[in-house]
Amino acid sequence: CNGRVASVGYCMGGVLSYLLAANSGVDAAVCYYPGSIEKRLDQAERITCPTLFHFAEEDDHIDSDAVAAVQEKMAEVGQAEIETYPGVDHGFNCWARPAYNQNAAALAHGRSLVFLAENL
């Protein structure tokens, strides 16, 4: 173990992962469809680690305006990668939910593993 730490979270956990990136000194963060994140963009300038966001294009909980606000703010901050998955809904990575999408989940999982390997 090299002592480096990442946070990974889904939905509310995605928001918590984002807040850890901004406030805790983790070395990397992955945030899957973080609900209501647009209400917490004041924390973005505090992010000091690489952060990866996964958003569902058809998300009923995080609309396209919220994703656009995150994209705009993170472009200013410069610490984030943002991936959007077309045709899928909130929870696309959870096999126990009706919104589960195996292709999008596999793609997001692979991207997360590469991101973590590159940043830890």
Map each language-model feature to its residues:
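N-terminal cap/leader regions of alpha/beta-hydrolase-fold enzymes
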Residues: C1-L120
